[in-house]
From Swiss-Prot:
Keywords: Cytoplasm, Glycolysis, NAD, Nucleotide-binding, Oxidoreductase. GO terms for biological process: glucose metabolic process; glycolytic process. CDD domains: GAPDH_I_C, GAPDH_I_N. Gene3D superfamilies: Dihydrodipicolinate Reductase, domain 2, NAD(P)-binding Rossmann-like Domain. This is Glyceraldehyde-3-phosphate dehydrogenase. Its EC number is 1.2.1.12. The gene is gap.
Length: 294
């Protein structure tokens, strides 16, 4: 997904990939995707390396990032997407190998700073190793920031209705740490924990301790939804909240926070480039201080 997204931009060039898959299988997985469809471009393999849209991409299969020799490939930024090197100490091996910066594609497991577009991205001060947090945090944080900046959040609960992930079981299987998580993904709605809401307190310190949440894993292949139930400090009608969201989506958060009043469903957001889209028709208000936002 990172590769496909990069191909849509003119300011990013993929020059090297490290994966334990062989290049032929890597090419196959890039060409064909059950959720996002066929790759819009040419993909070949030559001498163990990928040739994508006519450009050679170095392929390696190193288990230890310190041995990757990124500098030889001209690598500037590494997207650390294995899920295995989520501390400064382990991710720094990429720097040792010649990369200039590392972006973890999931939440860090130590004090490595997290930055989220639409939340605290303006506080980035050139750190060489950062985390982009989780997909749920990226969806929730812009929404929570707009609400808090305009109306104040006294307290809030989040539920994410989350699409199936690769770590779930196709049928019931052993899962010693999370018994429910071991149940068949295609057969069940599975309650689960998530640290995404608490992580918002790290990227938006003013909300630390005011927000927590949970997840339901559901049998859909892609697109998840955040349901944010908020007690507001400053009374506001639902129309006023919609107006604030629309203004943010067209202003400071354009390209990060989207806004729609269409009668959409989850598949309408396959390939969505905004990290969060406010569904104006889906939310409700009990009164001017208690609202549910989607």
């Amino acid at each position: 997904i990172v590769f496909r997204a990069a191909q849509e931009r003119s300011d990013i060039e993929i020059v090297a990939i490290n994966d334990l898959l062989d290049a032929e299988y890597m090419a196959y997985m890039l060409k064909y995707d059950s959720t996002h469809g066929r790759f819009n471009g040419t993909v070949e393999v030559k001498d163990g390396h990928l040739i994508v849209n006519g450009k050679k991409i170095r392929v390696t299969a190193e288990r230890d990032p310190a041995n990757l020799k990124w500098n030889e490939a001209g690598v500037e930024v590494v997207a650390e997407a294995t899920g295995l090197f989520l501390t400064d100490e382990t991710a720094r091996k990429h720097i040792t190998a010649g990369a200039k910066k590392v972006v973890m594609t999931g939440p860090s497991k130590d004090s490595t700073p997290m930055f989220v577009r639409g939340a605290n991205f303006d506080t980035y001060a050139g750190q060489d190793i950062v985390s982009n947090a989780s997909c749920t945090t990226n969806c929730l944080a812009p929404l929570a920031k707009v609400v808090n900046d305009n109306f104040g959040i006294v307290e809030a609960l989040m539920t994410t209705v989350h699409a199936t992930t690769a770590t779930q079981k196709t049928v019931d299987g052993p899962s010693h740490k999370d018994w429910r998580g071991g149940r068949g993904a295609s057969q069940n709605i599975i309650p689960s924990s998530t640290g995404a809401a608490k992580a918002v307190g790290k990227v938006l310190p003013e909300l630390n301790g005011k927000l927590t949440g949970m997840a339901f894993r559901v049998p859909t292949p892609n697109v998840s939804v955040v349901d944010l139930t908020v007690r507001l400090a400053k009374p506001a009608t639902y129309e006023e909240i919609k107006k604030a969201m629309k203004a943010a989506s067209e202003g400071a958060m354009k390209g990060v926070l989207g806004y729609t009043e269409d009668d959409v469903v989850s598949t309408d957001f396959n390939g969505e480039t905004c990290t969060s889209v406010f569904d104006a028709k889906a939310g409700i208000a009990l009164n001017d201080n208690f609202v549910k936002l989607v």
